[in-house]
Amino acid sequence: MSNNYKHDYEIRDDERVAIFIDGSNLYHSLEENCRRYDVDFGAFSAKLAAGRPHLRTYYYNVLRDPDRNHQAYQDQQKFLTALHSTPYLEVRLGASKLRGDVPVEKGVDIMIATDFLRMAWNDLYDTAILVSGDGDFSYAVQAVKDLGKHVVVAAFPANLSKELSQVADSKEYFTPEYFADIWSRRRGPERSGSYNNNDQGRRFGRPSPSRPRQPEDTVLDRNRRFDEKDDDFS
């Protein structure tokens, strides 16, 4: 990870930092803006913390239903195992329920807001970094500010709601370049950009005159395909 990155807001070396990651929101933002999502969460947390005392990173998402898609459940378990091995990172999982035939998140936003507020009330951090662009967190952000805490919202500009942008003390704006040195694996210049299960998706780099090499099929790649089928839960 580069030490030369300039953050979008003033950094105080003595402020205690807690990081709250809305996993589904981050996943879809990375898909949209970077066409990949295989972040090294340890390196990501370190970049966000920027050398300040780091209490912990909290990652929130929905637990897949093994009865609905067992392979997707197994792939998610492998992904979660990797997260559990990341130092100072806690995984918090909500459930999903069917609304008709469509699975919807249940309880994840409440989990994030509750931890966000509880830790501020208990004076466990000075600065909270909320990795989400979801405007539903606006009131919780204001409540944390009223407790005397500093709140940084980290998101891609195109995915940051107006309400959340206005209430945050500071913003950390993501770009594809922001993640260039914190991907969990390295790829060559050419990669299939098939994000709609279309083999003729966009390519990066000059195409080979021979049949294009298919990218390695990893757990995260399989997770993406199941996400597209299962209402995009990551």
Predicted regions and their residues:
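Domain-level signal for Mg2+-assisted phosphodiester chemistry and nucleotide/NA-binding surfaces
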Residues: 2-104, 150, 159
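Generic cytosolic/nucleocytoplasmic N-terminal low-complexity/intrinsically disordered segments
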Residues: 2-5, 148, 195-197, 228
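Proline-rich intrinsically disordered, low-complexity coils
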Residues: 53, 66, 103, 157, ...
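Nuclease catalytic cores that cleave nucleic-acid phosphodiester bonds
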Residues: 81-198, 203
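Intrinsically disordered, low-complexity RNA-associated tracts
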Residues: 188-234
